[in-house]
C-alpha cells in the first residue's frame, strides 16, 4: 500500500505522507474520573502536513463510517467529548484534528492490548493532565509503511527544532529524537520495556566486561513487551551491531538485546529485536537480505527507513544459539514464501532447505574448526592478487575507449526510445547483438587492442506481414547466421531472422503452448546446423522442429505436459543435451532427454527461478533468482550412483544436491539500495563459456553494477573479508552482461544507451568507493 502523498494538496497545506486507515482514540490517565480510553473517530486517516518552511503538523481526518452515526442523547454526549478534546479547533473540529509537530508531542510507536500497531502522542489541547491521543493503525497497512511514517515525523521534528533540512540529519540525530520520545513515555506506560528487568540489569558495563555479557546472553529471556500479537517461534539473546559505511565495519549498538520471531498469522512472521536503547522490527522476508555466518555465530540483515538502508548484525553467544535461531528463521521464511506449513514438508526436502540456507554451510563448519590453518604463503598470494586487481589503473584509463553509444544505430535519434533491452553474444565469431526498440545493433570485439566496435544496425524489424515488431528474447541459431525472436505479444509464435539479410524469413506457431522460454537443444548448437530448439510453457516442456509440415512446429513425441500448471519459468541445456527446467515456485527438474519423467527434482528454496544456465558437462547448474543466485553441484557423491550427475541418475535418499546461495552481503547491499533507491534484481547470470574450457567465473548485474563471482572463491570462503565477488559500477543501469565466448577475462556489458567491453580484473573488491560515489555518502550521515 503506497502511503506517500507528496505534493498533493489538502486545501493549501501539502500532505507529505498519510496512513489511510485507523481508529483515533483519547487516552486519559488512570487518575481521571472518566473512561481511560474513548474513541474519537472510529475510522480516520493520519497525515503529516507542511505548514511553513520548517513547520509541520499531524492531522487526523474523520472518515464517514456508519458505525459513527449515533442519534439522540448518545450522539450528544459523544460530540461533547469530542469538543473537549478539540477545544481550540475551528468549525471543522468534528471532521479534523491537528497539532503542530514539535518535541513536546513525544510522538512514538507502541502496540495496543490487541497487538495492533498504535501511534501515540501528547494531547496538548486536552482538559486534563497527562492526556494522550492514540491512532491505532488498521491491520491492512503494512509495517514498512508505518515505519516510513514514523521516520517522516522524526525528520519533521528535526527540521522544526534545528530550522534546517532533515537531509543534513545524521542517523544519530534521528535516533536521539526517537529515544527521547520513547524514554519520556515509558515512565507512565506499564506495558513499556522495564529497564530494571533481569534480562538487562547487568548490561550497563558489558561493553568492556565480556564475562558479564556472556552470562546475560546465556539466560532465557522473558517475552518482549511491544511486539505484534502471535506465537513465539524463537526467543533468544544476542548482541546488536550496525554497519558503518564510512568506517566500513560493524559497530556495537547494544551488548544485550532480546530477539524473537513471531507468527502473526496467514504465513506471515515478524522479527522483533528489543533492548534498553534499541527496538527494531521487520517482516521475515528475503528482501531484507538475511545472511548467516556460522563461523562467527552471526546473522546479518538490512533494515530500511525513509530511503536509507542500514545493515545490522546479531551476534549470538555461541554456535548453538545461532543454529537455534537459524532453524527458526529458515523455517519461517520458507513458510512465508511458499504459503505452506513446515510440517507438510517431506524430511528430505527439509534437510535440503536447511542445508542450503547458508553459503556454503559445510565449508563454514569447517572454517569454525580450521579458520587459522591456511598458510601465510596462501594468504599473501590472495592479498597480492587483490592488490593487483584494485590497482589496475591502466584498465580504468582505457575504459572510455571501449564504450560505444547504442545511439549509433539510431538514425535519426528517437526521443521516445526505451533504450537497450538485451545482449546476445555469438559463439562462432566476435559479434554481439544488442536489441533496441525495433532495431538490433551489431558490435564486434578486437582482441588485439581490447576494443569494441559498432559494425551495423538491423533496422525496422517486421514480421512476414510487414508489421513492425520489437524483438524479445533473441537466441542465435544455425551457425550464428540466424536469430530466433519473439515479439513480446504473441506467446505462441516465434520468428526466425536471417542476420545477413536483416529480415524475418519464417514464423513458427507452437499451437496452444504459450512459450515462456526457449533455448538450444544442446548448449553449443548455435555453432552447428542443428535446427531443433527446446522450450517450456507454464505446464510443459517441448521440442520445436521447423521441418514439421504445417504451422504447428511442436514435436509431440518429444514433449511432455503435466497435469495442472507447474508454472515453469526457465530452461537450460548441457553440451550433451541434458535439460534443466525451473519454475516460478522455485523448484528445478533435471532430465536426460525429453518426453520422460525427471531424473532429479530439486525442491524450492522460495524464490522463482528466472533463468538457468549449466556447465557444459552438467556438473554445475546456475539459477538466477530475483535477489540471489543458486549454484548447484549436481555430481552425486554417495551410493551406487556416485560419480554420476543428477541429469542421469537420481540422488540417493541420504544425499541432497549441494547448493550455494550467492547474494550480495547485507552491508554492501545496504549501500547499493541507498544509492540506487531500487531493490536488488539480478539479470541473467552466466558462466564463462568455451569449447573444452572449464567454467570458473560467473557474471551478472543489478542496477548500475556488474558483478562477478569466482567459483574458486565460492568454494574456498574462509569467513574473511576476501569476498568471492567483485563489483564494477557504471554510470547507467546494466541491461545485460556476458563473457566474450572462449574467455573469462573480458565481459561485454549492455547499458541503457551504451555497450561496453570491460576486463574482469577491473572489477573491484566491494568498498564504499566502489559502491557509492563519495558525494552520496551524505545519504547515511548528512
UniProtKB/Swiss-Prot annotation:
Q: Which residues carry this modification: Phosphoserine?
A: 170, 195-196, 222
Task: Alphabetically list the UniProt keywords.
Answer: Cytoplasm, Phosphoprotein, Ubl conjugation pathway
Q: Where are stretches of biased composition, namely Acidic residues?
A: 188-200, 385-397
Q: Which Pfam families match?
A: VID27 (PF08553), VID27_N (PF17748), VID27_PH (PF17747)
Q: Where in the cell is it found?
A: Cytoplasm
Which terms in the GO cellular component ontology are assigned? cytoplasm; nucleus
Return the annotated region ranges for Disordered. Answer: 188-215, 372-422
What are the Basic and acidic residues biased-composition ranges?
201-215, 372-384
Query: Does the keyword Cytoplasm feature in the UniProt annotation?
Result: yes
Residues annotated with Phosphothreonine modification: 486
What more does the record tell us?
Answer: Present with 3500 molecules/cell in log phase SD medium.
Functionally, this protein is described as follows: Has a role in the negative regulation of gluconeogenesis. Required for vacuolar catabolite degradation of fructose-1,6-bisphosphatase (FBPase).
PANTHER family on file:
VACUOLAR IMPORT AND DEGRADATION PROTEIN 27
Record's protein name:
Vacuolar import and degradation protein 27
Amino acid at each position: 500500500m503506497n502511503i506517500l502523498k507528496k505534493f498533493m494538496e489538502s486545501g493549501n497545506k501539502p500532505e507529505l505522507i498519510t496512513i489511510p486507515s485507523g481508529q483515533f482514540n483519547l487516552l486519559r490517565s488512570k487518575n481521571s474520573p472518566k473512561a481511560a480510553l474513548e474513541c474519537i473517530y472510529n475510522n480516520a486517516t493520519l497525515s503529516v502536513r507542511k505548514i511553513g518552511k520548517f513547520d509541520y503538523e499531524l492531522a487526523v481526518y474523520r472518515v464517514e463510517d456508519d458505525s459513527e452515526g449515533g442519534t439522540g442523547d448518545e450522539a450528544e454526549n459523544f460530540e461533547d467529548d469530542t469538543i473537549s478534546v478539540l477545544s481550540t479547533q475551528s468549525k471543522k473540529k468534528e471532521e479534523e484534528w491537528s497539532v503542530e509537530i514539535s518535541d513536546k508531542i513525544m510522538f512514538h510507536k507502541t502496540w495496543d492490548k490487541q497487538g495492533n500497531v498504535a501511534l501515540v502522542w501528547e494531547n496538548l489541547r486536552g482538559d486534563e493532565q497527562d492526556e494522550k491521543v492514540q491512532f491505532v493503525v488498521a491491520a491492512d497497512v503494512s509495517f514498512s509503511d508505518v515505519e516510513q511514517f514514523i521516520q517522516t515525523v522524526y525528520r519533521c521534528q528535526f527540521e522544526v527544532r534545528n530550522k534546517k533540512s532533515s537531509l543534513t540529519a545524521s542517523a544519530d540525530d534521528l535516533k536521539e529524537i526517537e529515544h527521547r520520545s520513547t524514554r519520556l513515555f515509558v515512565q507512565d506506560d506499564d506495558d513499556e520495556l522495564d529497564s530494571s528487568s533481569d534480562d538487562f540489569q547487568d548490561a550497563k558495563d558489558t561493553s568492556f566486561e565480556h564475562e558479564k555479557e556472556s552470562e546475560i546472553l546465556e539466560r532465557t529471556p522473558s517475552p518482549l513487551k511491544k511486539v505484534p500479537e502471535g506465537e513465539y517461534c524463537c526467543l533468544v539473546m544476542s548482541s546488536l551491531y550496525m554497519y558503518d559505511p564510512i568506517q566500513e565495519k560493524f559497530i556495537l549498538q547494544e551488548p544485550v538485546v532480546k530477539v524473537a520471531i513471531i507468527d502473526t498469522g496467514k504465513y506471515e512472521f515478524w522479527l522483533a529485536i528489543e533492548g534498553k536503547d534499541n527496538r527494531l522490527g521487520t517482516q521475515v522476508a528475503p528482501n531484507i537480505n538475511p545472511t548467516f555466518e556460522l563461523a562467527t555465530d552471526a546473522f546479518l540483515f538490512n533494515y530500511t527507513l525513509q530511503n536509507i538502508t542500514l545493515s545490522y548484525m546479531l551476534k549470538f553467544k555461541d554456535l548453538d544459539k545461532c543454529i537455534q535461531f537459524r532453524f527458526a528463521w529458515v523455517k519461517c521464511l520458507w513458510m512465508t514464501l511458499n504459503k505452506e506449513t513446515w510440517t507438510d514438508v517431506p524430511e528430505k526436502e527439509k534437510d535440503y532447505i536447511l542445508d542450503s540456507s547458508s553459503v556454503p554451510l559445510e565449508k563454514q563448519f569447517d572454517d569454525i574448526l580450521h579458520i587459522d590453518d591456511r598458510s601465510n604463503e596462501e594468504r599473501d598470494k590472495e592479498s597480492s592478487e587483490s592488490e593487483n586487481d584494485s590497482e589496475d589503473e591502466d584498465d580504468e584509463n582505457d575504459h572510455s575507449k571501449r564504450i560505444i553509444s547504442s545511439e549509433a544505430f539510431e538514425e535519426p535519434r528517437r526521443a521516445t526510445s526505451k533504450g537497450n533491452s538485451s545482449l546476445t553474444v555469438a559463439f562462432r565469431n566476435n559479434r554481439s547483438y544488442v536489441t533496441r526498440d525495433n532495431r538490433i545493433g551489431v558490435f564486434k570485439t578486437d582482441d588485439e587492442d581490447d576494443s569494441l566496435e559498432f559494425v551495423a544496425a538491423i533496422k525496422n524489424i517486421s514480421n512476414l506481414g510487414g508489421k513492425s515488431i520489437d524483438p524479445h528474447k533473441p537466441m542465435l541459431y544455425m551457425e550464428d547466421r540466424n536469430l530466433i525472436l519473439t515479439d513480446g505479444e504473441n506467446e505462441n509464435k516465434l520468428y526466425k531472422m536471417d542476420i545477413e539479410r536483416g529480415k524475418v524469413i519464417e514464423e513458427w506457431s507452437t499451437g496452444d503452448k504459450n512459450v515462456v522460454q526457449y533455448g538450444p537443444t544442446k548448449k553449443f548448437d548455435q555453432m552447428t546446423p542443428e535446427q531443433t530448439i527446446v522450450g517450456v510453457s507454464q505446464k510443459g516442456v517441448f521440442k520445436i522442429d521447423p521441418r514439421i509440415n504445417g504451422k504447428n512446429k511442436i514435436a509431440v513425441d518429444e514433449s511432455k505436459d503435466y497435469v495442472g500448471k507447474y508454472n515453469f519459468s526457465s530452461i537450460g541445456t548441457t553440451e550433451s543435451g541434458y535439460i534443466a527446467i525451473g519454475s516460478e515456485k522455485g523448484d528445478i527438474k533435471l532430465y536426460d532427454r525429453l518426453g520422460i519423467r525427471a531424473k532429479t527434482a530439486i525442491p524450492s528454496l522460495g524464490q522463482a527461478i528466472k533463468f538457468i544456465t549449466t556447465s557444459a558437462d552438467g556438473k554445475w547448474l546456475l539459477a538466477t533468482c530475483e535477489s540471489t543466485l543458486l549454484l548447484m553441484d549436481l555430481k552425486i557423491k554417495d551410493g551406487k550412483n556416485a560419480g554420476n550427475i543428477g541429469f542421469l541418475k537420481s540422488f540417493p535418499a541420504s544425499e541432497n544436491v549441494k547448493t550455494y546461495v550467492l547474494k550480495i552481503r547485507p552491508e554492501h547491499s545496504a549501500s547499493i539500495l541507498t544509492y540506487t533507491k531500487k531493490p536488488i534484481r539480478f539479470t541473467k547470470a552466466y558462466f564463462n563459456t568455451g569449447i573444452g574450457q572449464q567454467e570458473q567465473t560467473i557474471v551478472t548485474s543489478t542496477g548500475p553494477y556488474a558483478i562477478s563471482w569466482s567459483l574458486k572463491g565460492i568454494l574456498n570462503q574462509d569467513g574473511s573479508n576476501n569476498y568471492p565477488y567483485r563489483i564494477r559500477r557504471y554510470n547507467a543501469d546494466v541491461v545485460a552482461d556476458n563473457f566474450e565466448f572462449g574467455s573469462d577475462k573480458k565481459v561485454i556489458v549492455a547499458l541503457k544507451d551504451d555497450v561496453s567491453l570491460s576486463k574482469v580484473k577491473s572489477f573491484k573488491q566491494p568498498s564504499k568507493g566502489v559502491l557509492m560515489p563519495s558525494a552520496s555518502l551524505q545519504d547515511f550521515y548528512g
